[in-house]
């Protein structure tokens, strides 16, 4: 029986994880649930899954949850960073699902790694912001790191065992690998007239053609910043050089990524676009369990298509690839700027195409600094957010 803590329990990844746990009740137990401020959702999850601990990041939300949670459930409600770090490092915890969106998930995820936990990584920002530190911490602690993002999970499944066992430290060329092909659907605006993009609304941007996701990642998919962040994540997870990584537009989202070998072989991982599949794979690895996802019906799929990315349509993708080439400072700046810009777009403060402008302005202007510690990373993140908000004020 694996005891699991779910960071981001009330989000879409959290819901999918709990669905897989419910389908395999003899193998997994919910030890802790972590959410920001969604009291009603957390209450429902506590009643359904009966964790030992329910942690609310928002202190007022924790008080509300304590007031409404039935005492008979005997669930401890906690709040504050110290309690959160205590939860993810607790001796009783075997596995941590790291699914808090954005920079907020970095510190607890890194602490789980340092504690040597089995970490299922759905928070791509952890590697985007702290790639080298994160990989080094994994190496020192002996933590097991498994990628949940559908693309990175697909790549992982297509790799030989010696690479799977050495994430972040592997040598792709020595294993006969020539390229990693990172696929992306192109989002809801793949075929939209370029002249119409500036007027696209948050509701339109969040209407992904294939995947069911939260608002932030949905907007990132529409700008293809999500693919850019995944490009950076892949660089750290698989220890790649820039020339070993390629982005391929694949509108059907059936092939989740591919690995090309020296002998001309290409191995692809395929399946219906449902996050329960990669989640179940990570939870059970190296075994396989029931995920609740219907198997792929090739006769219904009909055809698969592939295109090169259009950087005029997707400037955020180009910015992310450039930042990856520049290094850790640039990717930290880009991530922070993008979080501020996307939130402003979702709140109607800026237009869709202005997201890329905010990101570019921060990349050009925010002074870079040495990144030797988590404190350095968080300081640069905070500095970038201040500048991004100033940039918003100037263009709003």
Curated annotation (Swiss-Prot):
Q: Does the keyword Metal-binding apply?
A: yes
Could you tell me which Gene3D superfamilies the record lists for this protein? 1.10.1740.10, NAD(P)-binding Rossmann-like Domain
The residues the record assigns to binding Mn(2+) are: 149, 151, 230
The signal peptide, as residue positions, is none
- What are the UniProt keywords, alphabetically? Isoprene biosynthesis, Manganese, Metal-binding, NADP, Oxidoreductase
Q: List, alphabetically, the InterPro entries matched.
A: DXP_reductoisomerase, DXP_reductoisomerase_C, DXP_reductoisomerase_N, DXPR_C, DXPR_C_sf, NAD(P)-bd_dom_sf
Give the highest taxon in the source lineage: Bacteria
Task: Tell me the Gene Ontology biological-process terms attached to this UniProt entry.
Answer: isopentenyl diphosphate biosynthetic process, methylerythritol 4-phosphate pathway involved in terpenoid biosynthetic process
- The EC number(s) attached to this protein equal 1.1.1.267
User: Pathway listed for it?
Assistant: Isoprenoid biosynthesis; isopentenyl diphosphate biosynthesis via DXP pathway; isopentenyl diphosphate from 1-deoxy-D-xylulose 5-phosphate: step 1/6
Cysteine disulfide links: none
Which Pfam families would you find in this protein's record? DXP_redisom_C, DXP_reductoisom, DXPR_C
The keyword Zinc-finger appears for this protein: no
Q: What Gene Ontology terms describe what this protein does at the molecular function level?
A: 1-deoxy-D-xylulose-5-phosphate reductoisomerase activity; manganese ion binding; NADPH binding
User: Which metal ions or organic cofactors does this protein require, according to UniProt?
Assistant: Mg(2+); Mn(2+)
| Chain residues that bind 1-deoxy-D-xylulose 5-phosphate | 124, 150-151, 185, 208, 221, 226-227, 230
Q: Which reaction does it catalyse?
A: 2-C-methyl-D-erythritol 4-phosphate + NADP(+) = 1-deoxy-D-xylulose 5-phosphate + NADPH + H(+)
The entry marks the following residues as binding NADPH, namely: 10-13, 123, 125, 214
Task: Give the protein's function.
Answer: Catalyzes the NADPH-dependent rearrangement and reduction of 1-deoxy-D-xylulose-5-phosphate (DXP) to 2-C-methyl-D-erythritol 4-phosphate (MEP).
Query: Which family is this protein grouped under?
Result: Belongs to the DXR family.
HAMAP family annotated for this entry? DXP_reductoisom (MF_00183)
Q: What is this protein called?
A: 1-deoxy-D-xylulose 5-phosphate reductoisomerase
Q: Which organism is it from?
A: Shewanella baltica (strain OS223)
Q: What is the lineage of its organism?
A: Bacteria, Pseudomonadati, Pseudomonadota, Gammaproteobacteria, Alteromonadales
Gene symbol of the encoding locus: dxr
């Amino acid at each position: 029986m694996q005891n699991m803590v779910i960071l981001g329990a009330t989000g879409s990844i959290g819901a999918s994880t709990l669905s897989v746990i419910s389908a395999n009740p003899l193998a997994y137990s919910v030890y802790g649930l972590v959410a920001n401020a969604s009291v009603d959702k957390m209450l429902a999850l506590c009643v359904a899954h009966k964790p030992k601990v329910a942690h609310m990041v928002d202190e007022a939300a924790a008080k509300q949850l304590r007031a409404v949670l039935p005492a008979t459930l005997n669930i401890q409600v906690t709040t504050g960073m110290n309690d959160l770090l205590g939860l993810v490092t607790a001796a009783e915890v075997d596995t941590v699902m790291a699914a808090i969106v954005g920079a907020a998930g970095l510190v607890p995820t890194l602490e789980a790694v340092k504690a040597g936990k089995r970490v299922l990584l759905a928070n791509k920002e952890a590697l985007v912001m702290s790639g080298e530190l994160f990989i080094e911490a994994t190496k020192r602690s002996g933590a097991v790191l498994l990628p949940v993002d559908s693309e990175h999970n697909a790549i992982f499944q297509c790799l030989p065992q010696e690479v799977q066992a050495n994430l972040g430290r592997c040598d792709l060329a020595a294993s006969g690998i020539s390229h990693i092909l990172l696929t992306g659907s192109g989002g809801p605006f793949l075929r939209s007239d370029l002249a119409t993009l500036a007027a696209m609304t948050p509701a339109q941007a969040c209407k992904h053609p294939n995947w069911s996701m939260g608002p932030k990642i949905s907007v990132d998919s529409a700008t293809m910043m999500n693919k850019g962040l995944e490009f950076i994540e892949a660089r750290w997870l698989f220890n790649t050089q820039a020339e070993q990584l390629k982005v391929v537009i694949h509108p059907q989202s059936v092939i989740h990524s591919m690995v090309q070998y020296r002998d001309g072989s290409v191995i692809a991982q395929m399946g219906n676009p449902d996050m329960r599949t990669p989640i179940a794979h990570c939870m059970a690895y190296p075994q396989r369990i029931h995920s609740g996802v219907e198997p792929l019906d090739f006769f219904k799929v009909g055809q698969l298509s592939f295109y090169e990315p259009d950087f005029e349509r997707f400037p955020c993708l180009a910015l992310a690839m450039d930042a990856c080439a520049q290094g850790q400072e640039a990717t930290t700046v880009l991530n922070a700027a993008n979080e501020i810009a996307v939130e402003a777009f979702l709140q109607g403060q800026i237009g869709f195409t202005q997201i890329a402008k905010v990101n570019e302005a921060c990349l050009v202007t925010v002074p870079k600094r040495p990144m030797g510690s988590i404190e350095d990373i968080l300081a640069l993140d905070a500095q970038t957010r201040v500048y991004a908000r100033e940039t918003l004020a100037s263009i709003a």
